[in-house]
UniProtKB/Swiss-Prot annotation:
The lineage of its organism: Archaea, Methanobacteriati, Methanobacteriota, Methanomada group, Methanococci. The active site is at C141 (nucleophile). Disulfide bonds: none annotated. Homotetramer. InterPro entries: DapB_N, GlycerAld/Erythrose_P_DH, GlycerAld_3-P_DH_AS, GlycerAld_3-P_DH_cat, GlycerAld_3-P_DH_NAD(P)-bd, Glyceraldehyde-3-P_DH_2_arc, NAD(P)-bd_dom_sf. This is Glyceraldehyde-3-phosphate dehydrogenase. Signal peptide: none annotated. It comes from Methanococcus maripaludis (strain DSM 14266 / JCM 13030 / NBRC 101832 / S2 / LL).
């Protein structure tokens, strides 16, 4: 049984904690928070042992009436691995100043740079490379989604060139500080966006073959990708079959009511998913087309949750708990109740 510590019980951290708690080969030994907010209170109510991420703030939790077991320093030595859920740039600082200092394995999230860790993780592409490693970066929600669809396409044809336009959500639903509210923003205005190089950090064979551009639009529900991939040769039926066989990809039909990201999220709600999470990415079947061996399709990414099962698989890889990535994926999916 692997002892997992969640450092940063926020948007990603709380989801990873719940996912780990559902596995039969790992357990959450504690979670940390920097301030005594409602998430800290709910962590305790869920039965997680709560620790102050910043020792000097421990008294704030006590004054707020939220019981804490101690500080990060009090629990980190008991962890086999730490999943870092800190905001962008803080993960790198934690890696250098905390995890390496204590000699504990750690996963940092996709807001950090590829060079900040030993490798970049995706369950389908880099499980073997990350096996037994000490410090790994779990790539972002967009990169995770692109890696899944590239895997499906690559399973039936060689990828010669990939062009992707990313339509990114402006902010998460709980974020009141980020926009835009009434604009479409190139993000970045330069091409390529960081997403292409990030995919290459997972799939080196796409170096020089992938180009991405991105814009932000006023929505909070999901990202969307418009994908165009030149291949060595395939057809629509092969691509649809490959998508159906690839873990954590759902094919949806606009003709069945899935005519927007709002309807996809409504589907997640109707499934009874916690926080309406959709760990799988959704590809519109009608959007799949192949013209002169070039694949076209559109997919939607739930930015808060598609990386969650990958974190669980990454734990198994780094702790050498399962050598077969597909077996880990199957085990994780079953525990989380994923469709595929």
């Amino acid at each position: 049984m692997a002892n997992v510590l969640i450092n940063g019980y926020g948007s990603i951290g709380k989801r990873v904690a719940d996912a780990v708690a559902k596995q039969d080969d790992m357990k959450v030994i504690g979670v940390t928070k920097t301030k005594p907010d409602f998430e800290a209170k709910m962590a305790v109510e869920k039965g997680y042992k709560l620790f102050a991420a910043i020792p000097e703030r421990k008294h704030l939790f006590e004054e707020a009436g939220i019981p804490v077991e101690g500080t990060l320093d009090d629990i980190i030595e008991d962890a086999d691995i730490v999943v870092d859920g800190a905001p962008k740039k803080i993960g790198k600082a934690n890696l250098e100043n905390v995890y390496k200092k204590h000699g504990v394995k750690a996963i940092i999230q996709g807001g950090e740079k590829a060079g900040d860790a030993q490798d970049s993780f995706n369950s389908l592409w880099s499980y073997d490379r990350c096996y037994g490693k000490d410090y790994i970066r779990l790539v972002s929600c967009n990169t995770t989604g692109l890696c899944r669809s590239m895997y499906a396409i690559n399973s039936v044809a060689d990828i010669l060139k990939a062009r992707i336009v990313l339509i990114r959500r402006a902010a998460d639903p709980n974020d009141i500080k980020t926009g835009p509210v009434n604009a479409i923003v190139p993000n970045p205005v330069t091409v390529p966006s960081h997403h292409g190089p990030d995919v290459v950090s997972v799939i080196p064979e796409l170096d020089g073959k992938i180009m991405t551009s991105a814009v932000i639009v006023p929505t909070t529900l999901m990202h969307m990708h418009s994908i165009m991939v030149e291949t060595s040769g395939t057809n629509r039926d092969e691509i649809i079959d490959a998508l159906a066989k690839t873990p954590r990809i759902l094919t949806v039909k606009a003709s069945e009511g899935f005519d927007s990201t709002a309807k996809i999220i409504e589907y997640a709600r109707d499934l009874g998913r916690s926080r309406y999470d959709l760990n799988e990415i959704a590809v519109w079947e009608e959007s799949v087309n192949v013209v002169d061996n070039e694949v076209y399709m559109m997919q939607a990414i739930h930015q808060e949750s598609d990386v969650i099962p990958e974190n669980v698989d990454c734990i198994r890889a780094m702790l050498e708990m399962e050598s077969d990535n597909l077996k880990s994926i199957e085990k994780t999916n079953k525990a989380l109740g994923l469709i595929k």
